[in-house]
Amino acid sequence: MGVYQDLAHWIYEGFYAAGAAPTPAEYFVVPQQGLPPAGKPSTNVIRSPGFAYNPCMRILLFSGKGGVGKTSLASATGLRLADLGYRTLVMSIDPAHSLADSFDLDVELFQVQTSDPFPIQDGLSIFELNIQKEIKRHWQQISSYVISVLRTTGISDVEAEELAILPGMEELSAMMYINQYRRENSYDVIVLDAAPTAESMRFISMPTTLDWYMKHIFPFQRNLLKAVRPIANRVAPIELPTDSYFANIRDLFEKLEGVDEIIEDPHTTSVRLVTNPEKMVLRETQRAFVYFSLHGLTVDNVIVNRVLPPEIRDAWFNEWHNSQDHVSRELEEYFAPVPVRFVPLFAREVLGKQRLQELAKVLYAEAEDPAAVTRTEKPYVFGKQDGMYEVRLRLPFATKGDIGLFKKGNELVVEIGTLRRHIGLPRSMATLVPSRARLENRLLTVEMKEPQ
């Protein structure tokens, strides 16, 4: 099991533990009003040389605590967008898929999980990743090697195939499809039905951690194994990974190139946090807001789902009303100036197109475009004030005691609780070190100076 443990350790260290970020994207986006007409590329995006993608596609990421209603709201948003004429894909990145259930697809349930978009109506498809099929499409060499290692331990082929699903495979597969659809101009809007908060953080951090792995670990692993393989294969109980294994990793990385720029571009990607008017869920939503901000994503809406309608009044429900009213006021205060929307609790379960369209009418105003770009404020910026270089990060809900700072190479590392974010510094600041930090009005300002 030693080689397999080493392999799992490499994957874990590269994909999970690094938490690193590349240097900021060498491109910028000029603010635009809404989206260009479907199928017509925008002309106001300036990109780094050699990186080409469809600049007019929007990504709406619905995230929140498990069970708050993300899938229903994402599905309703997809229906509204399709009715407005957008080529829309609602894509589940939650391992526990429920998109098919949301649209009440009984006969088609098992057809949906084919790793191909499933049409719902003109302009709308849904997509539930089937990880077994994704392994055959994208991870064949990696999976085959892991299975061969596991077989040497005496476990059955079926068990080996199950255990060969390594952490991060599903998230990276979803990222590859997002990148592919963007480059091929397949859709105008992709609505992502995300996993609960912790898994969502793993999803958005995957491209940057993979980038770190490819720069710092991959070349060393490949060259070392290439040198020792002829001797090691004579004495080791199993063969070491071949060149095709590393070629598979390189191919995956190339398919993901540029996806981090897509995810962190506020004119492309917006996060919509879904919550319920309950104190425990509110705390989770606050943490999610901080984590998304720390990763460079823009939250443009907070949606409070399942609010008790005012007409439901009796002695038993009064306490619930008082509690929800209190939490709702806190929500509006905490998240200002981010808009907070309130969606009432429906009389029965929201299932099927008709009920989802009713939900969409409550969620969005009649003339409202859910794909419109409404907030583009970046969570962190670089600047210069009174001759002093600064890094400014918007960190709502964080306190001074929560935050840790240190410099590593040409990166500024910010820690909040168990989360770590590596912020690549521009060349003009790469040699500087943090000298002082202050947290005022939800804004962390880190002053940088030359080392002594």
Give the predicted meaning of each segment.
Residues 50, 253-400, 413, 418-420, ...:
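C-terminal lobe/tail of nucleotide-utilizing enzymes
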Residues 43, 50-53:
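Short, positively charged and aromatic/hydrophobic N-terminal segments
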Residues 384, 407-408, 439:
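Generic beta-strand structural signal
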Residues 401, 430-450:
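Beta-rich strand-turn-strand
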Residues 27, 33, 41:
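Cationic, low-complexity basic patches in intrinsically disordered or flexible, solvent-exposed regions
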Residues 56-68, 72-257:
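Nucleotide-state-sensitive switch-loop elements of NTP-binding domains
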